[in-house]
Design a protein with these regions (language model features):
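Long, charged, low-complexity, helical-prone intrinsically disordered regions
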Residues: 1-161
Length: 161
């Protein structure tokens, strides 16, 4: 028996069967999807949104994100190093980034499920890609992936280290 899906999920509205939206309704739909991406990721930019197959084009999302920024709902800037282009973030994400930046580096090892949307190993972070299998976890230390495997295997390797 397969386990339940892991991670954060949200239902998307289907497009109208008529296929015709007013410009304002379409802008509102794209803004809703931009907010959904911001809720999921905290910080969004072109490379990270390329993972999302059901989102509109980057051009449409970028325009929506600029509107949200102009209304003061989100902030634009450079939040994640190593990526070109504009980035947008929620105020909560910015506060979290500042808190991490201002705190001393931790020796704590963190485990996340490979099926979690946070699994960006080999996608936008260095190293090999870890497939999103429900039985696989990834060990991180100081934001760097150390190794991955079944939970028991990873815990065993951590105890030996």
């Amino acid at each position: 028996m397969r386990g339940l899906p892991i991670g954060r999920w949200a239902c998307l509205k289907k497009a109208s069967s008529e296929g015709m939206h007013s410009a304002a309704a379409e802008e509102g739909r794209v803004e809703d999807l931009a907010r959904l991406a911001l809720q999921r990721w905290g910080v969004v930019f072109r490379e990270i949104l390329s993972r999302e197959s059901l989102l509109p084009t980057w051009r449409e999302l970028h325009q929506a994100l600029r509107r949200l920024e102009a209304r003061g709902e989100i902030r634009g800037g450079r939040f994640v190093s190593g990526f070109l282009g504009e980035q947008f973030a929620t105020t909560e994400a910015i506060a979290g980034i500042r808190a991490v930046r201002n705190s001393p580096e931790s020796d704590e090892t963190i485990l996340i499920a490979a099926a979690d949307p946070l699994n960006l190993s080999g996608i936008i972070t260095p190293g090999s890609r870890v497939s999103a299998q429900s039985t696989t976890v990834i060990a991180y230390k100081a934001g760097v992936p150390l190794f991955s495997g079944d939970l028991g295997e990873v815990r065993s390797r951590l105890q030996k280290a």
